[in-house]
Amino acid sequence: MALHAAVKGKLISVIGDEDTCVGFLLGGIGEINKNRHPNFMVVDKNTPVSEIEECFKRFVKRDDIDIILINQNVAELVRHVIDAHTAPVPSVLEIPSKDHPYDASKDSILRRAKGMFNPEDLVR
């Protein structure tokens, strides 16, 4: 019988408005790594775009994060950085916020995924 080492789970990170972050934190996703860096960032109207970019890049570099959730309206501010991220992990998912509904036409990840498939291949 082989012994299997326990694999430490990976994290979900969140970049979004206060309501989004609080909701996910209440759901239990909040973590602080050994360097005392949290896996979430609360963005408000006064948050500089450069700070959002740096946070996104930091989350991408962390090996303990597998999914980055980002409010779509925040993603629009750093679209060039998100579009430059082409690796499958961490996956980037754009989510709606309370004040901004989801718009599939603005989701670059969804557009990229649609480009991978030919619609005729999906029809039987």
Curated annotation (Swiss-Prot):
GO terms for cellular component: proton-transporting V-type ATPase, V1 domain. Pfam families: ATP-synt_F. The keyword Ion transport applies. GO terms for molecular function: proton-transporting ATPase activity, rotational mechanism. Keywords: Hydrogen ion transport, Ion transport, Transport. The keyword Transport applies. PANTHER family: V-TYPE PROTON ATPASE SUBUNIT F (PTHR13861:SF2), VACUOLAR ATP SYNTHASE SUBUNIT F (PTHR13861). Belongs to the V-ATPase F subunit family. Subunit of the V1 complex of vacuolar(H+)-ATPase (V-ATPase), a multisubunit enzyme composed of a peripheral complex (V1) that hydrolyzes ATP and a membrane integral complex (V0) that translocates protons. V-ATPase is responsible for acidifying and maintaining the pH of intracellular compartments and in some cell types, is targeted to the plasma membrane, where it is responsible for acidifying the extracellular environment. V-ATPase is a heteromultimeric enzyme made up of two complexes: the ATP-hydrolytic V1 complex and the proton translocation V0 complex. The V1 complex consists of three catalytic AB heterodimers that form a heterohexamer, three peripheral stalks each consisting of EG heterodimers, one central rotor including subunits D and F, and the regulatory subunits C and H. The proton translocation complex V0 consists of the proton transport subunit a, a ring of proteolipid subunits c9c'', rotary subunit d, subunits e and f, and the accessory subunits VhaAC45 and ATP6AP2. This is V-type proton ATPase subunit F. It comes from Manduca sexta (Tobacco hawkmoth).
